[in-house]
C-alpha cells in the first residue's frame, strides 16, 4: 500500500527516493508524483527546492540518458526523439548530444559489426536491410552511407 502524498514532506521524500534510484527529468518526476496522488500545487515548489539544492538536474539526466542509450547501441536521432517524447527542450537535448563524448561513428560501427558480422552489403537488398537497421537505431543517413561504402568515419 503506497503512502498518500498530501504534504510537502511526503512529496519530497518520494521524489528523493525516485532520484536515489536514477536521474529523472522534471517532467518525468512530476508525472510519477502525480501518479502517486500528489497535486501540482504541492509538487512544483518541492521540485524547485530540489533543483536549487542540486538534487534534481536536467543536465545530469540528459547526460545519463545519452550515455545509457548510446551504450545500448542507439544513435543520436533516436536518442533525441526519445528525449523529446519525455518532455525535454530540444535545445537542451541538442547541446547535451554535442557535449557528449560519444564517438557516434565508432558506436555505429560496433552496432553494425554485432548485427552483420562486418559483412558489407553485396547487393541492393542487403544494403537496404543494413541501412534500415542502422536508421531505425537512429544513426544519420550520411554516416550509414559512408560505413556501408567502406569510407572513413573519423570525422563523426
Swiss-Prot record:
<comment type="similarity">
    <text>Belongs to the RecX family.</text>
</comment>
<dbReference type="Pfam" id="PF21981">
    <property type="entry name" value="RecX_HTH3"/>
</dbReference>
<dbReference type="Pfam" id="PF02631">
    <property type="entry name" value="RecX_HTH2"/>
</dbReference>
<dbReference type="InterPro" id="IPR053925">
    <property type="entry name" value="RecX_HTH_3rd"/>
</dbReference>
<keyword id="KW-0963">Cytoplasm</keyword>
<dbReference type="InterPro" id="IPR003783">
    <property type="entry name" value="Regulatory_RecX"/>
</dbReference>
<dbReference type="Pfam" id="PF21982">
    <property type="entry name" value="RecX_HTH1"/>
</dbReference>
<dbReference type="GO" id="GO:0006282">
    <property type="term" value="P:regulation of DNA repair"/>
</dbReference>
<protein>
    <recommendedName>
        <fullName>Regulatory protein RecX</fullName>
    </recommendedName>
</protein>
<dbReference type="GO" id="GO:0005737">
    <property type="term" value="C:cytoplasm"/>
</dbReference>
<dbReference type="InterPro" id="IPR053924">
    <property type="entry name" value="RecX_HTH_2nd"/>
</dbReference>
<dbReference type="InterPro" id="IPR053926">
    <property type="entry name" value="RecX_HTH_1st"/>
</dbReference>
<dbReference type="InterPro" id="IPR036388">
    <property type="entry name" value="WH-like_DNA-bd_sf"/>
</dbReference>
<comment type="function">
    <text>Modulates RecA activity.</text>
</comment>
Amino acid at each position: 500500500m503506497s503512502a498518500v502524498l498530501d504534504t510537502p514532506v511526503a512529496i519530497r521524500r518520494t521524489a528523493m527516493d525516485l532520484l536515489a534510484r536514477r536521474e529523472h527529468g522534471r517532467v518525468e518526476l512530476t508525472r510519477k508524483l502525480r501518479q502517486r496522488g500528489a497535486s501540482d500545487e504541492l509538487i512544483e515548489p518541492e521540485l524547485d527546492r530540489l533543483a536549487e539544492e542540486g538534487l534534481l538536474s536536467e543536465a545530469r539526466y540528459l547526460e545519463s540518458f545519452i550515455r545509457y542509450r548510446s551504450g545500448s547501441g542507439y544513435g543520436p536521432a533516436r536518442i533525441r526523439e526519445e528525449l523529446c517524447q519525455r518532455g525535454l527542450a530540444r535545445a537542451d537535448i541538442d547541446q547535451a548530444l554535442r557535449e557528449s563524448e560519444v564517438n557516434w561513428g565508432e558506436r555505429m560501427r560496433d552496432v553494425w559489426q554485432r548485427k552483420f558480422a562486418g559483412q558489407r552489403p553485396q547487393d541492393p537488398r542487403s544494403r537496404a536491410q543494413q541501412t534500415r537497421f542502422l536508421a531505425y537505431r537512429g544513426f544519420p543517413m550520411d554516416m550509414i552511407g559512408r560505413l556501408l561504402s567502406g569510407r572513413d568515419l573519423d570525422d563523426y
